[in-house]
Amino acid sequence: MIKLIEKKKEFDDFFKDDIFYIRIMSLLKAYSTNYNFALFYKQLDDNGNITSIISRLDNDYTVCHNDDFDLLELEDFFTRIGFNSILGDDELALSFSYDYGIIMRTNKKVEKIINYATIDEYPKLMDLFNLEDYSTADFESWYVDVSHRIRHSCAKAVTLNVNDEIVSSGIFSSIYNNDAILTSVSTVPEFRRMGYGSALVSAMICDIKGKVYLMRDKNKNEKFYKKLGFENMGYWRMYK
């Protein structure tokens, strides 16, 4: 059975130590159950135990499940309800077409120091939007979502500046219970291969008490992130 939850505490009996749990729980912390564009579901077995949790932001879904989840029920649920995208691990083997990549994780804290550069923990979001590759995103909707998450301590934006100009930026798109998900790391082209990007990521990792996760494309950036202490943890799938 899959049910829409009405209160945050309905997820209290479920836990999984992975990136999808952080993503869902951070979204729930930020928006609670107060908005019709951010919805949350639980899948229950015959004994009433939660076997998976699901978040929906607009029409984009994330699924976190345990070993006893009902894959066929989830397949039927998404077929009936429709979706723009579904994000989960490779055990969420739905019949829809998908892209996939690698999940990485680290809890190693090694801060790198670069002379003449400073960290700004409260940058203007417009500056980040202009630097990052958000060609398919609408600034207003992106700004409303990210700023809302930041105000609720569920996300964080950081830049590395040289002479008061941004040379590199990164965002923790989800923060929950001292763990975080790193996304949208970017460096201005003329400042690449100079150590600024790795210095920023290292500083961001040190700012998180727990683990830091990321999702990368299967053939990109493995060496860069491994040098910063990240290890491959499995695969993500994005159904569309």
Predicted regions located by residue number:
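Hydrophobic secondary-structure block in the mid-to-C-terminal portion of proteins
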Residues: 144-189
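Acyl-donor-binding surface of acyltransferase catalytic domains
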Residues: 45, 50-117, 236-240
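Conserved active-site alpha-helix within GNAT-family acetyltransferase domains
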Residues: 91-99, 198, 218-236
